[in-house]
Structure formats: C-alpha cells, structure tokens
C-alpha cells in the first residue's frame, strides 16, 4: 500500500511538473513552422525566441479572426478591449484581413521589459467582391512589459508603404 501511494504521488508530481513546463513555455513554438521560421535567427537567445513566439501567436490570432486572442496581448481596460473586439469582429464580417510578419527584431529585452520592431504587410479584401481595400508594409514598434505574461503597453506604428501599386502593376501584366 505504501509503495503504491509513493508511486502515485511521484506520478502526480511528475505530471504536475510536466504541465508547468509546458504551460510556462508560452504555448506553441513557431520556430520550426515553415511559415514563420525565417523570423528566428541563430543569435536569438531563449528570451528573444519566447518574445517572438508571443508576437507571432498574436498575429496568427489576427489572421484567424480570433479577436480575443489578438487583443489579449494588449494592456487595456476591459471596456476598451470589448470595443476593439467588437470593431474587429464587425470588420471581419465584410473583409478578409491579414498581417504577415516579414521580420521581428528585438531592440532590447530583459526580465520585465522589451521592445520589438515588427515589419509586416497588412492586407484587406472585400469578401463579396474580392476587391483589395488596402495593402501596405509597415514597421510597428511594440513596447512591452511582463507581469506574468508579456503585454503590449505601447504600439507605435511606423510609416506605411503603400503596396497597392504592386497589385495594379501585377494585375495589369497578367490580364
């Protein structure tokens, strides 16, 4: 009986430890994902990789239409969160939205603070007509704090490079 109890306690402890390790790792790792592996470099330490995974997960939520998942990274009051989620959901009813990261550079990162520059292309297409509503490239700066989880406290958009002309030129040459 004593041996069985000890064995059960050891199994429970091992399961709890495994759960904590998986739960604390921050979830899915995009480092080996073909769509995102180019965002990681050989010089990235574990902290940079973890931060990049958080940002990619947020953009992935945006692309999947998961408003709650996308806005979960932003440090905002509940009423602001509810407003933004409603706006996002409304936009997604009429348009396909996507933001594709081209690069993520960690400007600095320490135990509780980080700043990352995300260069990405963003695009919206009307669901009914397929018309491209916008298509641009920008570099956005995330200033982040960690209080258990990483949160964006300030999002500073950079200048937008309009890419609509590339669509027009491409469509003109293919028709």
Locate predicted features:
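Short, low-complexity N-terminal intrinsically disordered segments enriched in polar/charged residues
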Residues: 24-64, 72-73
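K/E-rich alpha-helical interaction surfaces of small helical-bundle regulatory domains
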Residues: 65-67, 158-159
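Intrinsically disordered, low-complexity repeat and linker tracts
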Residues: 17, 27-42, 164-175
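Short solvent-exposed beta->alpha transition segments
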Residues: 53, 67-117, 124
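Exposed beta-sheet edge and beta->alpha loop/turn motif
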Residues: 111-175
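C-terminal motif of bacterial Sec signal peptides marking the signal peptidase cleavage site
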Residues: 19-23
